[in-house]
């Protein structure tokens, strides 16, 4: 036996490429245990060195990536093989050492079960096992497992491998009172938990006692558990942490044919540890469909100078036979009409769907035929109709098939979808028995291929397709691609039938296509998916370079894939970026503190980084919620028929943040607060709350569990959620939200996107001068479209209150009502309307043909109305030719001078207010109007008040109550909020006090004026500290304008809003410009006016240079227009009284559109010119520019990206629109990029831009990761001090995420809080400077994406003091400064 090994010898065991020296032995090598005769027949002699340890894989059979197999050059292929050969030869040398140090005996007798456990009696002998194919081999298979290190069990689906074999082993040990600890892996959670539950129920054991399970967060097991089922990932995490298998006596790995990345890495680690420190653990591999020889050779063991393959045991027999059929075998279909299958184009055509539906309808005949009773009547029809399992590739196909089947109303089918995104309650329905006389149809993805067994399935319909996760060669972004399933997978699917009776499998491909085109095996995930988490686990194992260990995998990944993953881990910060570029190792890197954290978290790398940065900046709680929510299925419900309501609800949760992630946080916190206050005490209340708020309760509970799990896991790294309650004033809340948005940008670097600018001139023309914030455009309007205005109004009712519709030829402009006391922004109703278009909601009108209308209205020349512009005003309930009503309500008509004296009555926000003119003329008009109204005998409203209704409402002034013209804003209970249209203020009024307004009082234009200070926008400080303006800015502005008489100078009139300069007179002093005061205080900054405003300004200058009288011509009605008005009235009456008959045509409208809708593009080099789509569930799936005149770049951050099969289009998920702060995209990029190179102008006097990425290779001059390089041109001026501030903030981050004696694990809570506060203040200071950065015209570098373009003499190193002392494992290196000339 071995003497005690030294620490150095143990470390050498675990490092590939090192040999163990100076090993002292006692005794001689033992004889290998004798196996059964069958074992000797199956074993093949393999010469030393010729086994799997020395053989490179056949790369042609397993291409490194599906798209790259034909592109990779021969030299690349040879280097891939070379690295695998090199490290497998090193492994073979280790085996030679292994043979020389084998101990003479086993590990000694295990302690008895009774001594180790309080479970003293496990009634294994009294249990009667079910009669399954494996039952007849019980003794033999247990004996083989005990006699061999590794056994491979191959048997048909349903033979009893997963449920019976672990029990055989358990009972074997119980009968001998010997200790055992058996773990069985399952690829899916549902499989592990359901099998454990089934066994405990069969054996009448308490779940969590002898048998238990652990899936992700949920562990139902105790110290007494002897048989535990768990997912592959859970076991892998346990083994990597322990670096040993000795926690278990038996490891049973089920479904090994599923070549996931986790599965292959688990096999690699188990194989490695079996040969080092865990040689007495028994390993069993099981599957119904695997290439046994490949696995047997992989687990070959050295015996007497030979490599002996692992033992293969065949379980013969099946529960019931399953017959296979192909399209050729189906006689009832017209084969000539079927679309041919193409290997290059995996797709389900409409005719193949129809074949599946027809098959399902034929199963009744088949059931009758099989029962031998063909004369059954409908009343005697089979009460138990066998279930059908249909395999489809994805949710879209499931939904389509679901619609086809549910339309067969009289066929008595119960259709259930089975997909990972389907609500959990619905998933459980597949296990329920159908209603008697009904047939259960399960539409499933490959989730039902293994682990999930529905026992009553008799028929399987297989489209032979799947969606596989692949990694794009160029971008490394993942995408789910439709592809043909492998024969292995299809055979696994076939095995789902025939559990309780004879089964049938229908493969919807032709037999020759199956034989010649369907691949035999699936391409292992390790060859087509990112390797990040695997490489981090390799680094934790500390067994040498990642490529050395991965070379020994069953299907080793390509060397280029390993190199790329190392670079991506350096980009995210899990591996350190070397300060000296020449020291950079492309195949390895030092694990940073962040890397160690990521390796321990059950979330992807970017979400792990989010948690760590959340800890740094004091928003850990929010980041934990986001990470938990994004790791699991989205808890926001977007029902197919109620998608718009679900979207609206999500927008409401996000507030004004425009962030999916913040919506998740707010929804989670609201749910949690409701639970804590007892509102959701009962499950029924909670479910109702979930339905009302479009939240899936089971999923949000899962998020809560993962949140708690993550909180526990990070506590070992001294990261804790701050339990102290901060001062929760409004400014703190908004600052916290901004910091969280910055943290999101840091975590999801480089998923950065900017927007193309809309053409304002074209947009104004497209909207015909309508307000883009309130209006959408429809196209393909039928002739005489104004007849259908009520239909059109009802189509948009779910979006918001329609104020007016203007019909202009084949176009219509739908304008929504805006609350006059809300800030300027694009209305939610406009977003909802554009969302309808995105969701392809059908906008269909029932119409008459133009000829029919003209034919039925005799004696009238109505044809002239075909293209007349008609305005339908719902507020005034009028339908007029456009010119008659166009200017009557336009407030610009009340402007008879560019200088006005006003009283402010209502402040909406900073720079936006209502008031009325107090000159003598206007005062007289208001006085006369008020007197006339209050002399009338007022009549109550004839109908219930509704938003937009114009009426008369009381207002108490100087203790005297009088009535004034008012508009209802909204109704709540027994009161309404009204807006006084002649003064601009608002008030709450009891409903019974509202009175009807006589028609004559609607003729005078509303006298209140709406004002907006021109050429001003919020500063960064205001945007960060408030919703749009900070509380401080709002209070300061209110103090300047309230209770004062102001002088305003009109710059322009845009959509009835006066854009003005505002002056305040104070005593005898000169006038104070209020905009200048706000800028001096740091609340505002200068900006450009919009194109429309500038146009209006020019028009006003022209008008006021002439006589004022010329301004009133537009409102004079023309006789011709009166004639058109009469014809419109006649047509409307004919339509409403049904004189035209019932409409017999349908008109499909196109739209709605808004020309200010923004399209985004990527900042990274590889994706700059790719088309970008934002997933429809995202809040930002619709983005409309509120300020098209502001040309500063705006930025969007995406939590995850994927691309389509062709690589042409990117899909963004969980997006956040960053605040519109000038220079923000450049600042965020510099702050979070691993390496930057500043661009300077030709004279070296100022910075013009920055190149961000991983830097360049000094030896070749090439970019290290060119695909993710980002070139930005600055649109504001940055100084040397700005770059220094960025470095100071990076250094502050490093202090909270570093290892070592001064690392964050050693800091006390007070010091952590102090460092967090410093980081927060530095971050806010970087973005909120007292003086805004100067605007400059962007100037692109003449050599974009080229590194090393700065004279080295101008470059100044900024090395961190601590990084120069030794090994550098900081998260962020300090950027090199470029010195500017004077």
Swiss-Prot record:
In this chain, the stretch annotated as Disordered covers 36-62
Using the UniProt entry, name the condition the protein is associated with: Spermatogenic failure 30: An autosomal recessive infertility disorder caused by spermatogenesis defects that result in non-obstructive azoospermia or cryptozoospermia.
Q: State the organism of origin.
A: Homo sapiens
Enumerate composition-biased segments (Low complexity). Answer: 47-62
Entry protein name = ATP-dependent RNA helicase TDRD9
- GO biological processes: cell differentiation; fertilization; male meiosis I; male meiotic nuclear division; piRNA processing; spermatogenesis; transposable element silencing by piRNA-mediated DNA methylation; transposable element silencing by piRNA-mediated heterochromatin formation
Where is the motif named DEAH box mapped on this chain? 254-257
> What PROSITE patterns would the database entry show?
HELICASE_ATP_BIND_1 (PS51192), HELICASE_CTER (PS51194), TUDOR (PS50304)
Where it sits in the cell: the answer is: Cytoplasm; Nucleus
Q: What does this protein do?
A: ATP-binding RNA helicase required during spermatogenesis. Required to repress transposable elements and prevent their mobilization, which is essential for the germline integrity. Acts via the piRNA metabolic process, which mediates the repression of transposable elements during meiosis by forming complexes composed of piRNAs and Piwi proteins and governs the methylation and subsequent repression of transposons. Acts downstream of piRNA biogenesis: exclusively required for transposon silencing in the nucleus, suggesting that it acts as a nuclear effector in the nucleus together with PIWIL4.
